Amino acid sequence: MADREEHQGLLDGDRDEDEGDKAPSVHLNPICDPNHLLHRILVLIFMCFLGFGSYFCYDNPAALQSQVIQDMNLNTASFMQLYAWYSWPNVVLCFLGGFLLDRVFGIRLGTVIFSLFVLVGQIIFAAGALANHFWLMNVGRFVFGIGGESLAVAQNTYAVNWFKGKELNLVFGLQLSMARLGSTVNMNVIGWVYGRIQMSMGSAGPTTLGITLMIAASTCLFSLICALVLGFLDKRAERILNKEQGKTGEVIKLTDVKDFSVSLWLIFIICVAYYVAIFPFIGLGQVFFIEKFGFTPVQARAINSVVYIISAPASPLLGFLVDKTGRNVMWVMLAVITTLLSHMMLAFTFWNPWIAMSLLGVSYSLLACALWPMVAFVVPEHQLGTAYGFMQSIQNLGLAVMSIAAGSILDVRGYLFLEVFFIACLCMALLAVVLLYLFDYYKEGGLNLSAATRSKRAKPE
């Protein structure tokens, strides 16, 4: 099992260097020594900012929902195509991205290539707005999506390669925190940027929208630089620590998918059913809060971003909590139930929506910290890239279909029916969590073990 091969943890800087990778033959400054805590923290910083630009630009349409619809003369269903076109390529390419990381490019070159796709895609997206061609904007989102989700696979694989062990949940939480910092900044800043450009141009329109989106592309350039630096540091660590000696030597095959366990397939179902109730809702949330609660556009953007605002500081804290307690399945169940309650409050009550959105932010963070690391517990290490890629792939199949469905439901039936639709998806996720718990218990698996028990299992005999 993957959880039996412990790597050095993030907080274990003083562990005996003879356990695991070979120590450097010469004395190095702590921040330059791959075995030292300071160096691994440096790597973690670049690892976290790797997805900053992608997350910042992913929700550009959500933060500019009213402006995009007005400037490009769209209905809601057409607007949601911007999210669908992001997701469609990853139904296949995200899975292949994990395969390419494992067999073709390697983690370092693959990360740089995917970062380039993100940057080029955002530039095409902005150019489409400048030229007033919505089809070109969709092309940009398509290219952006090819890089965005595959980059997330690379980020997850980097995390496991460097920090697999008892702090892996914390590292996943920190990664999510920094990525969601990008989403939060986007939600609260890009509208202001649009307003300033509108004042300078003298009017709104496609040109104003295009310039705003082109400015947003600078964050993707920043993430590309992080990918280059991270690749250099990883290559250097491989040379110093002779990491190649510790590789399994096994060659991954695409046919390995048929050997994925029932537990892994249930994790995939939870992932899809849960996230289709999060991202499409945020994509359409601005107008929802304006129409139902009478918020101004500025207030609507603020509350629509609260999920990301909360997840930024909460993710590492909740990741640390999951690390120390274990019981991943129970934490996932709690997150799904809390999210279900949040959507029910938004759908059927007029309570202050800050309550529901705050609960949604906490539960979203908790699920990410508890769900994604479970993949490393149920697949061999040499298949991690493919497993994470497949997880992202079917997630994007769900998001592509549900984004179009959500836009159509909203145009025809309104927000109440849309919320009922999201609630049904969460009920499916809850059923999958219950089945995962029962199957893991029956098979005496390790997904719901306490942290102490899991640590004992991981120690060599």
UniProtKB/Swiss-Prot annotation:
Membrane topology: Multi-pass membrane protein
Localisation: Lysosome membrane
Disordered: annotated segments: 1-22
Keyword Transmembrane: yes
GO CC annotation terms, alphabetical: lysosomal membrane; lysosome
Primary location: membrane
GO MF term (any one): dipeptide uniporter activity
Single GO biological process annotation from the record: protein stabilization
Gene3D superfamilies (UniProt xref): MFS general substrate transporter like domains
Reaction it catalyzes: L-alpha-aminoacyl-L-arginine(out) = L-alpha-aminoacyl-L-arginine(in); L-arginyl-L-alpha-amino acid(out) = L-arginyl-L-alpha-amino acid(in); L-arginyl-glycine(out) = L-arginyl-glycine(in); L-alpha-aminoacyl-L-lysine(out) = L-alpha-aminoacyl-L-lysine(in)
Task performed by this protein: Lysosomal dipeptide uniporter that selectively exports lysine, arginine or histidine-containing dipeptides with a net positive charge from the lysosome lumen into the cytosol. Could play a role in a specific type of protein O-glycosylation indirectly regulating macrophages migration and tissue invasion. Also essential for liver homeostasis.
Similarity section: Belongs to the major facilitator superfamily.
Subunit structure: Homodimer. Interacts with lysosomal protein GLMP (via lumenal domain); the interaction starts while both proteins are still in the endoplasmic reticulum and is required for stabilization of MFSD1 in lysosomes but has no direct effect on its targeting to lysosomes or transporter activity.
Free-text comment on this protein's domains from its UniProt entry: The dileucine internalization motif is required for lysosomal localization.
Name of the protein in its database record: Lysosomal dipeptide transporter MFSD1
Organism: Danio rerio
Lineage: Eukaryota, Metazoa, Chordata, Craniata, Vertebrata
